[in-house]
Amino acid sequence: MPGTRGPRVAMLSVHTSPLDQPGTGDAGGMNVYVLELSRALARRGAEVEIFTRATSSAQPPVVDVQPGIRVLHVPAGPFEGLDKNDLPGQLCAFTAGVLRAEAHRSEGWYDVVHTHYWLSGQAGWLAAERWDVPLVHTMHTMARVKNAALAPGDVPEPQGRVIGEEQVVAASDALVASTREEAEDLVRLYGADLDRIHVVPPGVDLDTFTPPVPSDATARTALRERLGLPVDSPLILFAGRVQLLKGPDVLVQALEHLPEEVRLVVLGGASGRPTAVRELEALAHQCGVRDRVLVHPPVERRRLADWYRAADVVAVPSHNESFGLVAAEAQACGTPVVAAAVGGLRTVVLDDVNGVLVDGHDPLAWADVLGALLADDGRRARLAAGARAASRRFGWDEAAAAMLDVYAQATKRRPAR
């Protein structure tokens, strides 16, 4: 990598654009990760071009996000109507689009290919070989991990994805894991070379996700009024895609066993199944709590911080999370988190320090934990203070510095492969 300038990074995110609204469709923490990491890399002098599949004829071919960051919409298959599981059939077209973009550059333009999720890894593998640059890959989720922790009624990941992930793991010059547990899964489940794995925790935008100022009850009341939320009710917030993997149904069923005044706010849209929100509302009706569940579409990130601040507790009942960005963001806003003791959530949430971990997904167990915390103002205040302190562990500038080191190490080791 040249020493006179920052690296030129081809960032691939096939199935979801960093410009999409998180909380709907396939847009979630990975979108935030790709965009915020790119911004932090650009602040350190890198030039980042993000390749993503075009999903609308109205999308411009290129979007200049800010100096040093461009998003390129690559036509690959129909704009609409493709499920994520249909995308392997469009990878040849996507890869060709990525290679065409480089063809308009001077030879050797890109210094590194950084891919996100296995679909991108497949395309990036070919691009990196063609350009003779290192391939750095971040899994974000793994089929074997997801299939071992399926929610009741959820559909397992196909074997084709497992094979694709094995290929990408073997081809990568460097693998980036968000936590040590994820690194161990890469070795245990995919036979990854430990020497090629780098643990780089994602960051949180600590300028956006901040504690409320002022933090008194009057300010909380005004905030809830502005958001259209009940002023006097204890509020549990679920923020994320409405899908079985994320476990919002656990909270709806738990609500049946909580005091009448408690409200659950579901901030997110359907993912995978277009009827997911309606099905969750039907479950709430079946449990007799429909009037206590408030469903709101996802909001842009600066507004999201206010929703975290307005809640008494943020609940993350996911069946699996490689990291748990919602938990980290909520903590940065000074809101205690109740989370499932799975995956990366065990790294983000330190039990009884900045939140509470719950074993399993039994609604009664969740009701017990949530009810006890909502009834204990002193404990919530202590956990809120711990949450604010713990959030300082995660910053995007630190993540970018570590990632630049990963790129440099991958470049050094590539000739030996």
Curated annotation (Swiss-Prot):
Catalytically driven reaction(s): 1D-myo-inositol 3-phosphate + UDP-N-acetyl-alpha-D-glucosamine = 1D-myo-inositol 2-acetamido-2-deoxy-alpha-D-glucopyranoside 3-phosphate + UDP + H(+)
Instruction: Spell out the molecular function terms from Gene Ontology.
Output: acetylglucosaminyltransferase activity; D-inositol-3-phosphate glycosyltransferase activity; magnesium ion binding
Domain of life per record: Bacteria
The GO biological-process annotations, alphabetized, read as: mycothiol biosynthetic process
Residues bound to Mg(2+) are Y308, R309, A311, T335
Keywords from UniProt, A to Z, are: Glycosyltransferase, Magnesium, Metal-binding, Transferase
Pfam families per UniProt: Glyco_trans_4_4, Glycos_transf_1
Q: Spell out the InterPro entries in the cross-references.
A: Glyco_trans_1, Glyco_trans_4-like_N, Glycosyltransferase_grp1, Mycothiol_biosynthesis_MshA
Q: Which residues bind UDP-N-acetyl-alpha-D-glucosamine?
A: Q21, P22, G29, R241, K246, V299, E321, E329
Record-listed E.C. numbers: 2.4.1.250
Where, by residue number, does 1D-myo-inositol 3-phosphate bind?
H15, D26, A27, G28, G29, M30, N31, K84, Y117, T141, R161
Q: Which family does it belong to?
A: Belongs to the glycosyltransferase group 1 family. MshA subfamily.
Q: What does this protein do?
A: Catalyzes the transfer of a N-acetyl-glucosamine moiety to 1D-myo-inositol 3-phosphate to produce 1D-myo-inositol 2-acetamido-2-deoxy-glucopyranoside 3-phosphate in the mycothiol biosynthesis pathway.
This protein's assembly is summarised as: Homodimer.
Question: What name is this protein filed under?
Answer: D-inositol 3-phosphate glycosyltransferase
